[in-house]
A protein has these predicted regions:
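Metal-dependent nuclease catalytic cores in nucleic-acid-processing enzymes
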Residues: 90-106
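Interdomain/boundary linker segments immediately adjacent to catalytic/signaling cores
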Residues: 1-41, 138-142
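Conserved catalytic cores of phosphodiester-cleaving nucleases, focusing on short active-site segments
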Residues: 63-65, 69-80, 93
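Active-site metal-binding core of divalent-cation-utilizing nuclease and nuclease-like domains
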Residues: 38-69
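Short Gly/Pro-enriched loop/turn and capping motifs at secondary-structure junctions
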Residues: 80-82, 116-117
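Domain-level recognition of nuclease-like catalytic cores that cleave nucleotide substrates
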Residues: 4-7, 19, 104-142
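Active-site-adjacent loop/helix micro-motif of nuclease/hydrolase catalytic cores
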Residues: 56-58, 81-91
Length: 142
């Protein structure tokens, strides 16, 4: 695998107007990011919507939380809980970020508003920092 690089939104992606549901999802994502930024520790970096290029592919994790210590947390935000998120977080984002943050462990988390089966790990977004290295968790937050 080639070394991943950080970049801007690819020019070849369409600029179609988001659907009503997509707009709701974007607003919820911004709400989560704002909450994390306003309530978090100043020594913790929150990277929102960063594009990553590698192996002729491109991906964009919703949030990357980089605390001073402990694992870096890769976060996927959804309006409604999805069942296949862990695989995407580990196999797509995890592989690229493991190369960018060599020597740091990763953890993975899905934050969602609406529950559709399963049990939430927590109800508070900052509990993502309690995840152990390579652990996956889910947080329902409204």
């Amino acid at each position: 695998m080639s070394s991943p690089t950080l970049g801007h939104r690819p020019t070849y992606l369409s600029n179609n107007k988001p659907t009503r549901i997509q707009r709701k999802g974007i607003l919820y994502e911004k709400k989560v990011v704002k909450h994390l930024a306003e309530t978090g520790d100043l020594s913790t970096f929150i990277i929102h919507g960063q594009w990553i290029y590698w192996d002729k592919a491109v991906c964009q994790p919703d949030i990357i939380v980089v605390p001073q210590q402990g694992p870096i947390v890769v976060v996927e935000i959804k309006l409604t809980r999805k069942r296949n998120v862990e695989k995407k977080l580990r196999e797509v984002y995890g592989e690229a970020l493991q190369r960018i943050f060599a020597g740091r462990a990763l953890s993975f988390c899905q934050v969602y508003k609406n529950l559709d089966g399963g049990e939430p790990f927590s109800l508070e977004p900052w509990d993502i920092l309690a995840l152990k290295p390579f652990e996956y968790g889910e947080i329902q937050w409204r």
